[in-house]
Amino acid sequence: MIRTALLSVSDKNGIVPFAKSLHEQGIKLISTGGTAKLLAENNLPVVEVSSLTKFPEMLDGRVKTLHPMVHGGLLARRDFPEHMAALEEHGIDTIDMLVINLYPFNETVAKENCSFEDAVENIDIGGPAMLRAAAKNHQDVTVLISPEDYAPVLAEMKANQNVVSYKTNLALAKKVFAHTAQYDGSIANYLSALGDDLDHKARSAYPETLHLAFEKVQEMRYGENPHQSAAFYKDIYPVNGALANYKQLQGKELSYNNIADADSAWECVKSFAGNSGGAAACVIIKHANPCGVAVGASALEAYQKAFKTDPSSAFGGIIAFNIPCDGAAAQEISKQFVEVLIAPSFTDEAKAIFAAKQNVRLLEIPLGNAFNTFDFKRVGGGLLVQSPDAKNVLQNEMRVVSQRQPTPSEMNDMMFAWRVAKFVKSNAIVYCSNGMTLGIGAGQMSRVDSARMASIKAENAGLSLKGSAVASDAFFPFRDGLDVVVNGGASCAIQPGGSMRDDEIIAAANEHGIAMIFTGTRHFRH
């Protein structure tokens, strides 16, 4: 049973009404510093920790709760007679509830003008010590670190005469240890990223030790293959617009492959937000590769154009829009087998149409342009870490290297093709025209084979490549790749450049009479 609660929070959100409810339940309130002052200002009877310990706060508040009167009350096992006898001998009362959140270290170091001294002063010492003590003794102590837990714990107390179940206490203790581990990991990451000069602005993006924290969203029936187990974890604080922010409206549970493909689709279609002249964009993904991408005046038109690229591969694919999915688009999509459909929102008409196809997984994700801090790739015994491929080359940063200048329509097509090529597995070749992909060659060990594959894909779909734009995610190492795409029908090409044979490739472009652009940026994707 809870009789005494110690409250000391940096996040004051909801603490006053929570403390009032505790007081109304007959619970004694103990507090420190600013929290005690706030409670007193709201006419709540509160005992200062310094009155409890008979020792004043000292060292600018660095020492206030590190005392046996506090930790004895938290750590004593109520079912151990010798523990209770020791408390009685030393005049220590039990503390049955601890409500704490820690100094805002992460928020402090996120500030551009943060000094090393600011960072160090926001390393909490007493808070984690109390949290760990209370969580260790979760059999007897209820410990809360988040305002979101106030209401459910209060409800349980009111229903059970101030008793909180062991199940609840254990769940809260698990949350505490995850939180303190993350907190200490953040401190270690920050300090090990600093150089000898301790310059906040010059700290490395890659600390000497890297501590990561994720929380489990779900366990899955299996992983990439049925014999593999799997689970999906998300960042503690996913960035704006990330797949992990999805809300599933209907459909079966997402599989491992669904989530991997959905991420590819969503990241690709997001790249058209604000870059498509206000047009709708649609991306169709199969095995993490785009098999159709298009823009149009509506979601329906964008989908129809994207679907034309490779109808057979689109079967059982993942579809994403950068605008709301309306009834017209939903009606057309419902004619096909679709695993997952993603959009910023769905109209009521679209929802009604898909309600008849309950196996289709509908995901709503708010649009956003933020990127993960890091991309990761697990290797044997280690982890490759890099910044995300977030660079968008602007038109004025590109260089026309051919004798012939591209026409405005060719420039638009090349920009479109370049945006798509970034999301195709290397080696990537993408043909585009009039805001839609015509043929995509992905994942071949030879660039010339990817070029041939893209041409074959277009031919199989009955699409003409005459006058199309072609994008290559990396430079053409030899002229044979360029010869293949030009013979296929391309009138212009966009590529990074940087080959030892650039002069030979440029000469080939001039020989063919096509326009060619160098971006200076490569987009390998493995």
Swiss-Prot record:
GO terms for biological process: 'de novo' IMP biosynthetic process. Pathway: Purine metabolism; IMP biosynthesis via de novo pathway; 5-formamido-1-(5-phospho-D-ribosyl)imidazole-4-carboxamide from 5-amino-1-(5-phospho-D-ribosyl)imidazole-4-carboxamide (10-formyl THF route): step 1/1; Purine metabolism; IMP biosynthesis via de novo pathway; IMP from 5-formamido-1-(5-phospho-D-ribosyl)imidazole-4-carboxamide: step 1/1. Residues 1-145 form the MGS-like domain. Its EC number is 2.1.2.3, 3.5.4.10. One of its GO terms (cellular component) is cytosol. One of its GO terms (molecular function) is IMP cyclohydrolase activity. Keywords: Hydrolase, Multifunctional enzyme, Purine biosynthesis, Transferase. Coiled coil: none annotated. Pfam families: AICARFT_IMPCHas, MGS. InterPro entries: AICAR_Tfase_dup_dom_sf, Cytidine_deaminase-like, MGS-like_dom, MGS-like_dom_sf, PurH-like. It catalyses: (6R)-10-formyltetrahydrofolate + 5-amino-1-(5-phospho-beta-D-ribosyl)imidazole-4-carboxamide = 5-formamido-1-(5-phospho-D-ribosyl)imidazole-4-carboxamide + (6S)-5,6,7,8-tetrahydrofolate; IMP + H2O = 5-formamido-1-(5-phospho-D-ribosyl)imidazole-4-carboxamide. Belongs to the PurH family. The IMP cyclohydrolase activity resides in the N-terminal region. This is Bifunctional purine biosynthesis protein PurH. The lineage of its organism: Bacteria, Pseudomonadati, Pseudomonadota, Betaproteobacteria, Burkholderiales. The gene is purH.
